[in-house]
């Protein structure tokens, strides 16, 4: 079968022929329909410092997908061949304190598909049946293909009560864009998104952000004054940029709450005085709550949330290089590749 493989220890990704995997007793073989390119895939493609520490060459990458059940393991029940599914990309151990305590999204033994084990940029893949998420008929496959990052956005946006609140989102990547839309959809007052990429800021505005701010041209404090704000009640840090995080700390209202998804460089500093004396809450976010986030984000789409607005490109798998080029240049929202 075809698969996108990180074959060499340098920039690039390679379309190769690899064996079709065989499902174990508790696994399902999935025939992929569509897969989306994630920022993690771009890191692996670029072979940055994180990738060099984490990825073993020969890995099939990818973790955002939708497909149909092709074969059931001998012990699997509750699914049918041909059923359309996505899946939680974090495979957890099931026996640690957090898994047994109902917090599997915090499992310290988590294995990520397309990072630690072979992933979804392939014609077929295997997944534990317990990780599957059935996709309702009303949701098109091109949207279901990126439920994984949509779930990251939903986890962040729903971590704190944003109804009637002023929300600052630093970083207008696809997750930040989607989070802006969710916050407005559920009743936030002002949602302000910052970045330095005008293309992606436009997507955030289209998704419903009250104001988008290119911080290389406009002062966030000036925007706050225009909106008659003393500070932000909730912050969603999506950029992984220490300067953006420190700007957020500076602009938070006393008692504000911050959800952090962006990964900061090792050793990055922050102004701890602002966290302490403003009484801020800072919550790390990793992945999606299993499976409460999946339920809520599915219902959001079914209730009219315009997830389609972040989808900018659909390409056949043979044009994967174009997709990675668009992502590297920052000239795309979500890019979905088709295996059909």
From Swiss-Prot:
SUPFAM superfamilies per the UniProt record, alphabetical: GroES-like, NAD(P)-binding Rossmann-fold domains
**Which residue positions does UniProt flag as site: Important for catalytic activity for the proton relay mechanism but does not participate directly in the coordination of zinc atom?**
148
Q: Which GO terms describe its cellular component?
A: cytoplasm
> Binding of Zn(2+) 2: at which residues?
93, 96, 99, 107
The free-text cofactor remark is: Binds 2 Zn(2+) ions per subunit.
Cofactor section? Zn(2+)
The pathway it acts in is:
Amino-acid degradation; L-threonine degradation via oxydo-reductase pathway; glycine from L-threonine: step 1/2
User: From the Swiss-Prot or TrEMBL record, what is one GO molecular function term?
Assistant: L-threonine 3-dehydrogenase activity
Give the signal peptide range: none
Name the positions where Zn(2+) 1 binds.
Answer: 38, 63-64
Residues the record lists as binding NAD(+): 175, 195, 200, 261-263, 285-286
This enzyme catalyses: L-threonine + NAD(+) = (2S)-2-amino-3-oxobutanoate + NADH + H(+)
Its Enzyme Commission number(s) read 1.1.1.103
Task: Tell me the Gene Ontology biological-process terms attached to this UniProt entry.
Answer: L-threonine catabolic process to glycine
Please explain the role this protein plays, according to its UniProt record: Catalyzes the NAD(+)-dependent oxidation of L-threonine to 2-amino-3-ketobutyrate.
UniProt cross-references to HAMAP family, sorted A to Z? Thr_dehydrog (MF_00627)
Q: Please give the NCBIfam families that the UniProt record associates with this protein.
A: PRK05396.1, tdh
Subunit-structure text: Homotetramer.
Q: Which family does it belong to?
A: Belongs to the zinc-containing alcohol dehydrogenase family.
Instruction: Please report the name of this protein according to its UniProt entry.
Output: L-threonine 3-dehydrogenase
Organism, by scientific name, is Xanthomonas oryzae pv. oryzae (strain KACC10331 / KXO85)
Q: Which gene encodes it?
A: tdh
């Amino acid at each position: 079968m075809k698969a996108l493989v990180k074959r060499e220890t340098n920039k690039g990704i390679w379309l190769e022929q690899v064996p079709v995997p065989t499902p174990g007793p508790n696994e399902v073989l999935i025939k992929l329909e569509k897969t989306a390119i994630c920022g993690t895939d771009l890191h692996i493609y670029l072979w940055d410092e994180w990738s060099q520490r984490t990825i073993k060459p020969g890995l099939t990458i990818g973790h955002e997908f939708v497909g149909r059940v092709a074969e059931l393991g001998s012990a699997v029940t509750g699914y049918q061949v041909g059923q359309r599914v996505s899946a939680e990309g974090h495979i957890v151990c099931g026996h640690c304190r957090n898994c047994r305590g109902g917090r599997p999204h915090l499992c310290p033994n988590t294995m990520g598909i397309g990072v630690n084990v072979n992933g979804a940029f392939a014609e077929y893949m295997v997944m534990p049946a317990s990780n599957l998420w059935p996709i309702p008929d009303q949701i098109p496959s091109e949207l279901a293909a990126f439920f994984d990052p949509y779930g990251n956005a939903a986890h962040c946006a729903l971590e704190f009560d944003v109804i009637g609140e002023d929300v600052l989102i630093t970083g207008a990547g696809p997750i930040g864009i989607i989070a802006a839309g969710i916050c407005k959809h559920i009743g936030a007052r002002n949602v302000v998104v910052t970045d330095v990429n005008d293309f992606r800021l436009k997507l955030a505005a289209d998704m419903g952000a009250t104001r988008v701010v290119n911080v290389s041209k406009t002062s966030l404090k000036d925007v706050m004054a225009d909106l008659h704000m003393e500070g932000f009640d909730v912050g969603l840090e999506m950029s992984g940029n220490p300067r953006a995080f420190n700007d957020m700390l500076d602009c938070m209202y006393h008692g504000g709450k911050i959800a952090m998804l962006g990964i900061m460089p090792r050793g990055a500093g922050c102004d701890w005085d602002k966290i302490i004396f403003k009484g801020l809450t800072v919550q790390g976010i990793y992945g999606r709550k299993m499976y409460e986030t999946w339920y809520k984000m599915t219902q959001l789409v079914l209730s009219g949330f315009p997830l389609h607005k972040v989808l900018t490109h659909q390409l056949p798998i043979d044009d994967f290089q174009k997709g990675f080029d668009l992502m590297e240049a920052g000239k795309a929202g979500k890019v979905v590749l088709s295996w059909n």
